[in-house]
Amino acid sequence: AFLFISAQDIEKAVLVHEYGHLLGLVNMGYTSPHDHEDPDHPHHSNNEESVMYWAIESQDFYNQLDGEPPNNFDTYDLDDLNLMRQGKL
């Protein structure tokens, strides 16, 4: 079956992903209390459901997809951002 992914879906995922890096995700200048950094892809999530997953900015992105690309931060990403906002990271 052919899966159509719109340019807008891809653009949103990439923009949110890069914005996450600008905010410091994942483990850029801090150490997360959560073990969610991919050891093979530094500063990226090991959760395929997170917009911070490494394949979002990779050619492998298209090979990894079996649906719409993730465009939201996962629970650990959001918790890291909240802890940074509170000055706890």
Residue ranges of predicted features:
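The catalytic-center signature of Zn2+-dependent metalloproteases
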Residues: 2-78
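Pan-zinc metallopeptidase signature
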Residues: 78-89
